[in-house]
């Protein structure tokens, strides 16, 4: 098995809430808590969960747009979480991000060509001809006409803007692209086009993708592995096919059961799930899911379940479904759980299910 492109170990992010004159005993928002995983070159890891579970915060931590409270983010063996700003600059080329909102993530004062070439010009001096060739090549690569290079974002549709965002991310030839809800603001037909584009680009260039989404139908098509987050923690990390065929964690079961099934002849899994996601400021003791879990036992209320490996290659944090009788697992070993032996991208998406 090849070395991982990205390795995340015990990544944590707390936001202190300032209160009172002396700011003593300041409560914190536990946005991301002890997250570990690995991503290989050419792999797509999907991160799913309800709103507020920490998905977008995780994406910003991986990009070092915000600093972690603790933990490590290793890109090709280098911990970028500990780098100074001047040292981090060189690593920006290896990781790029496609943001959720295609309307506010593009500079309205720049043309499409300028938006694409701006990241490269931060590192290299380009002639006018080189800028034109780069913009034309990347616009074609994302399925847009070269004539669009002279247009402004306000003259484009949402799908065209998202394609432009992808072209900008590809300009620096990164090894990893993080897509944070990159298709959620688009209509269904445009979603399929963007997803097909990402998968085609991955097959052509071998880039790794971290795809953040709440749409399980999209995840089932584009992902190789899936990390399910709940209240800042990963509760299940699994190969895609195993996760959708037989989810193990009760929360994963509930998510899949809640997804609409267009086939009336297909039986739906009924999983009772009551209540709302607890506050990350005052999370429940033990397993954060226990107030909503139909399987909760006394141990769930007292101890935080570790993410432990299962015989089928997945990892689950559940005292009932995956009792942790084994010794403590190091963050480094935990990050490598459920790694696929080979990466085989999924097929072309014709339409959303």
UniProtKB/Swiss-Prot annotation:
Binding-site residues for ATP, renumbered to this chain: 49-56
GO molecular function: ATP binding; ATP hydrolysis activity
Matches recorded under InterPro entries: AAA+_ATPase, ABC_transp_ATP-bind, ABC_transporter-like_ATP-bd, ABC_transporter-like_CS, Oligopep_ABC_C, P-loop_NTPase
GO biological process: amino acid transport; peptide transport; transmembrane transport
Database matches in NCBIfam families: oligo_HPY, PRK11308.1
Top-level taxonomic group: Bacteria
Annotated GO CC locations: plasma membrane
Assigned protein family: Belongs to the ABC transporter superfamily.
Claim: Chloroplast is one of the keywords in the record: no
Official protein name in the record: Probable peptide ABC transporter ATP-binding protein y4tS
Main subcellular localisation: membrane
Native source organism of the sequence: Sinorhizobium fredii (strain NBRC 101917 / NGR234)
Cell compartments where the protein resides: Cell inner membrane
PANTHER family recorded: D,D-DIPEPTIDE TRANSPORT ATP-BINDING PROTEIN DDPF-RELATED, TRANSPORT ATP-BINDING PROTEIN
UniProt domain ABC transporter: residue ranges: 6-256
Membrane topology: Peripheral membrane protein
Keywords: Amino-acid transport, ATP-binding, Cell inner membrane, Cell membrane, Membrane, Nucleotide-binding, Plasmid, Transport
Physiological role: Probably part of a binding-protein-dependent transport system y4tOPQRS for a peptide. Probably responsible for energy coupling to the transport system.
